Protein backbone atom coordinates (compact mmCIF):
# COMPACT_ATOMS: atom_id res chain seq x y z
CA UNK A 1 0.00 0.00 0.00
CA UNK A 2 1.07 3.59 -0.53
CA UNK A 3 2.33 3.08 -4.07
CA UNK A 4 1.30 5.40 -6.86
CA UNK A 5 -1.11 4.39 -9.62
CA UNK A 6 -0.04 5.61 -13.06
CA UNK A 7 -2.46 5.61 -15.99
CA UNK A 8 -0.68 5.05 -19.29
CA UNK A 9 -2.41 6.15 -22.52
CA UNK A 10 -5.99 7.41 -22.82
CA UNK A 11 -9.11 5.77 -21.49
CA UNK A 12 -11.92 4.90 -23.90
CA UNK A 13 -9.88 5.05 -27.12
CA UNK A 14 -10.62 1.50 -28.24
CA UNK A 15 -14.32 1.97 -27.54
CA UNK A 16 -14.34 5.32 -29.35
CA UNK A 17 -12.79 3.76 -32.45
CA UNK A 18 -15.29 0.88 -32.39
CA UNK A 19 -18.18 3.34 -32.12
CA UNK A 20 -16.83 5.27 -35.11
CA UNK A 21 -16.51 2.06 -37.11
CA UNK A 22 -20.03 0.87 -36.24
CA UNK A 23 -21.90 4.18 -35.96
CA UNK A 24 -19.98 6.29 -38.47
CA UNK A 25 -23.12 7.39 -40.33
CA UNK A 26 -24.77 8.75 -37.18
CA UNK A 27 -21.56 10.51 -36.17
CA UNK A 28 -21.04 11.96 -39.67
CA UNK A 29 -24.28 13.92 -39.19
CA UNK A 30 -22.86 15.59 -36.07
CA UNK A 31 -19.13 15.97 -36.68
CA UNK A 32 -16.94 17.29 -39.49
CA UNK A 33 -15.16 14.62 -41.59
CA UNK A 34 -11.80 15.88 -40.32
CA UNK A 35 -12.81 15.15 -36.73
CA UNK A 36 -13.65 11.51 -37.50
CA UNK A 37 -10.57 11.05 -39.71
CA UNK A 38 -8.36 12.38 -36.91
CA UNK A 39 -9.80 9.75 -34.60
CA UNK A 40 -9.25 6.96 -37.14
CA UNK A 41 -5.63 8.11 -37.47
CA UNK A 42 -5.17 7.53 -33.73
CA UNK A 43 -5.74 3.79 -34.14
CA UNK A 44 -1.97 3.31 -34.43
CA UNK A 45 -1.45 5.08 -31.10
CA UNK A 46 -3.48 2.62 -29.02
CA UNK A 47 -0.76 0.06 -28.27
CA UNK A 48 2.72 0.78 -26.95
CA UNK A 49 5.24 -2.00 -26.43
CA UNK A 50 7.66 0.78 -25.51
CA UNK A 51 5.57 1.61 -22.41
CA UNK A 52 5.88 -2.00 -21.24
CA UNK A 53 9.66 -1.96 -21.75
CA UNK A 54 9.99 1.26 -19.74
CA UNK A 55 7.77 -0.14 -16.98
CA UNK A 56 9.87 -3.29 -16.80
CA UNK A 57 13.01 -1.24 -16.18
CA UNK A 58 11.51 1.24 -13.72
CA UNK A 59 10.32 -0.61 -10.65
CA UNK A 60 6.70 -1.23 -11.58
CA UNK A 61 5.26 -3.66 -9.02
CA UNK A 62 2.00 -4.36 -10.88
CA UNK A 63 0.44 -3.72 -14.29
CA UNK A 64 -3.21 -4.08 -15.16
CA UNK A 65 -4.50 -3.66 -18.72
CA UNK A 66 -7.67 -1.62 -19.08
CA UNK A 67 -10.09 -3.50 -21.28
CA UNK A 68 -13.79 -4.20 -21.24
CA UNK A 69 -15.68 -2.16 -18.66
CA UNK A 70 -13.15 0.66 -18.86
CA UNK A 71 -10.97 2.18 -16.19
CA UNK A 72 -13.55 1.76 -13.43
CA UNK A 73 -13.66 -2.02 -14.00
CA UNK A 74 -9.85 -2.17 -14.24
CA UNK A 75 -9.41 -0.30 -10.95
CA UNK A 76 -11.88 -2.64 -9.24
CA UNK A 77 -10.27 -5.77 -10.70
CA UNK A 78 -6.76 -4.61 -9.80
CA UNK A 79 -7.71 -3.78 -6.19
CA UNK A 80 -9.76 -6.96 -5.79
CA UNK A 81 -6.99 -9.16 -7.20
CA UNK A 82 -4.28 -7.61 -5.02
CA UNK A 83 -6.45 -7.29 -1.90
CA UNK A 84 -5.73 -3.56 -1.60
CA UNK A 85 -7.61 -0.31 -1.39
CA UNK A 86 -7.10 2.72 -3.56
CA UNK A 87 -7.75 6.41 -3.78
CA UNK A 88 -7.91 7.97 -7.26
CA UNK A 89 -8.94 11.29 -8.80
CA UNK A 90 -11.29 11.32 -11.80
CA UNK A 91 -9.91 14.62 -13.12
CA UNK A 92 -6.43 13.12 -13.48
CA UNK A 93 -7.61 10.29 -15.74
CA UNK A 94 -6.45 10.97 -19.28
CA UNK A 95 -9.39 11.00 -21.67
CA UNK A 96 -9.35 12.66 -25.07
CA UNK A 97 -11.92 15.34 -25.81
CA UNK A 98 -12.95 13.38 -28.90
CA UNK A 99 -13.88 10.40 -26.71
CA UNK A 100 -16.00 12.62 -24.48
CA UNK A 101 -17.81 14.11 -27.48
CA UNK A 102 -18.51 10.74 -29.12
CA UNK A 103 -19.75 9.37 -25.77
CA UNK A 104 -22.07 12.36 -25.34
CA UNK A 105 -23.81 11.56 -28.65
CA UNK A 106 -24.83 8.13 -27.33
CA UNK A 107 -25.11 9.09 -23.63
CA UNK A 108 -22.24 6.79 -22.65
CA UNK A 109 -19.83 6.98 -19.72
CA UNK A 110 -16.23 7.16 -21.06
CA UNK A 111 -14.96 5.77 -17.75
CA UNK A 112 -16.85 2.51 -18.43
CA UNK A 113 -15.85 2.26 -22.09
CA UNK A 114 -13.45 -0.41 -23.33
CA UNK A 115 -9.92 0.95 -23.20
CA UNK A 116 -7.68 -1.72 -24.70
CA UNK A 117 -4.15 -0.33 -24.99
CA UNK A 118 -4.37 1.75 -21.81
CA UNK A 119 -2.68 0.30 -18.73
CA UNK A 120 -2.64 0.93 -14.98
CA UNK A 121 0.85 0.67 -13.47
CA UNK A 122 1.56 0.58 -9.74
CA UNK A 123 4.96 1.82 -8.56
CA UNK A 124 6.66 3.48 -5.61
CA UNK A 125 8.26 5.86 -8.15
CA UNK A 126 5.25 7.28 -9.98
CA UNK A 127 6.73 10.65 -10.88
CA UNK A 128 9.89 9.03 -12.31
CA UNK A 129 7.87 6.58 -14.38
CA UNK A 130 5.50 9.28 -15.62
CA UNK A 131 8.39 11.51 -16.74
CA UNK A 132 10.21 8.65 -18.51
CA UNK A 133 7.07 7.69 -20.40
CA UNK A 134 6.33 11.30 -21.35
CA UNK A 135 9.90 11.76 -22.64
CA UNK A 136 9.13 8.88 -25.02
CA UNK A 137 5.92 10.59 -26.15
CA UNK A 138 3.69 8.20 -24.20
CA UNK A 139 0.82 9.84 -22.26
CA UNK A 140 1.02 9.04 -18.54
CA UNK A 141 -0.51 10.53 -15.41
CA UNK A 142 -0.45 9.69 -11.70
CA UNK A 143 -4.13 9.25 -10.87
CA UNK A 144 -3.88 8.15 -7.25
CA UNK A 145 -2.35 5.65 -4.87
CA UNK A 146 -2.93 2.30 -3.22
CA UNK A 147 -4.13 2.18 0.40
CA UNK A 148 -4.33 -0.22 3.33
CA UNK A 149 -7.61 -2.08 3.71
CA UNK A 150 -9.97 -2.45 0.79
CA UNK A 151 -11.77 0.89 0.46
CA UNK A 152 -11.86 1.94 -3.18
CA UNK A 153 -12.33 5.69 -3.24
CA UNK A 154 -12.82 7.91 -6.26
CA UNK A 155 -12.61 11.69 -5.89
CA UNK A 156 -14.50 13.79 -8.38
CA UNK A 157 -15.56 17.42 -8.19
CA UNK A 158 -14.52 17.59 -4.54
CA UNK A 159 -16.81 14.68 -3.67
CA UNK A 160 -15.77 11.32 -2.32
CA UNK A 161 -17.52 8.24 -3.60
CA UNK A 162 -16.82 4.56 -3.46
CA UNK A 163 -16.01 2.53 -6.53
CA UNK A 164 -18.82 0.12 -7.34
CA UNK A 165 -18.50 -3.40 -8.63
CA UNK A 166 -17.95 -3.10 -12.39
CA UNK A 167 -20.93 -2.52 -14.66
CA UNK A 168 -21.07 -3.95 -18.19
CA UNK A 169 -19.03 -2.15 -20.82
CA UNK A 170 -20.77 0.88 -22.30
CA UNK A 171 -20.53 -0.61 -25.81
CA UNK A 172 -23.21 -3.08 -24.70
CA UNK A 173 -25.61 -0.13 -24.36
CA UNK A 174 -25.12 0.80 -28.02
CA UNK A 175 -25.96 -2.77 -29.05
CA UNK A 176 -29.05 -2.69 -26.79
CA UNK A 177 -30.18 0.60 -28.35
CA UNK A 178 -29.81 -0.90 -31.83
CA UNK A 179 -31.81 -3.99 -30.83
CA UNK A 180 -34.60 -1.85 -29.39
CA UNK A 181 -34.77 0.25 -32.57
CA UNK A 182 -34.87 -2.87 -34.76
CA UNK A 183 -37.40 -4.71 -32.57
Identify the function of each model-found stretch.
Residues 39-114:
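Active-site-proximal betaalpha loop/short-helix elements
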Residues 1-41:
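Phosphate/diphosphate-binding glycine-rich loops and adjacent basic-rich segments that engage nucleotide
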Residues 11, 16-21, 74-76, 152-156:
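Short acidic, glycine/serine/threonine-rich loops at helix termini
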Residues 21-25, 76-83, 103-106, 131-139:
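Short, solvent-exposed amphipathic alpha-helical segments in soluble enzyme
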Residues 122-128:
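Helix N-cap motif at beta-to-alpha junctions
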Residues 136-183:
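Acidic, Ser/Thr/Pro-rich beta/coil linker or hinge segments at domain junctions
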Residues 6-10, 114, 122, 144:
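Short beta-strand segments
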Amino acid sequence: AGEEIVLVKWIGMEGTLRIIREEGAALAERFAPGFLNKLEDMRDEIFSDRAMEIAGRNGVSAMHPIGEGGILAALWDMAEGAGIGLSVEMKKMTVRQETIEVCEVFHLNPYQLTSTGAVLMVTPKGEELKERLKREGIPAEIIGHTTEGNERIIWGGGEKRFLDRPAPDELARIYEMKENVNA
